[in-house]
Amino acid sequence: RSYIEVKGRIHGSETFTVTANEIQFGQTQKEHHKLALVDVHPDGPDHDEIRYITQAFDHIESNVTTQSYNEKWRDYWSRGAPPL
């Protein structure tokens, strides 16, 4: 079984938000979890782009007092790959 967490942002956005629960779930699912980033282009869906990132949240240490994280879009985008 695979799980995909989808985050879409308007083209040019600098950050995206991910909750502590989403991070924890991704970390427990390991290779069964993918983060899908959707770059939504203002010129329409023909210009949208998608990147898949595996083990996207492995570098984050969860904190019980933190409910969400603002992550740098560019950092994750550069780690991803387009769909096959």
Segment roles from a protein language model:
Residues R1-G8:
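Conserved catalytic cores of phosphodiester-cleaving nucleases, focusing on short active-site segments
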Residues E5, T19, A36-V38:
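Residues in well-ordered beta-strands of folded domains
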Residues I10-N21:
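Active-site-adjacent loop/helix micro-motif of nuclease/hydrolase catalytic cores
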Residues S13, Q24, P42-P45:
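Accessory, usually C-terminal, subdomains that scaffold auxiliary metal cofactors
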Residues A20-E22, Q27, E61:
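Solvent-exposed, flexible loop/coil residues
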Residues Q29-K34, V38-L84:
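Domain-level recognition of nuclease-like catalytic cores that cleave nucleotide substrates
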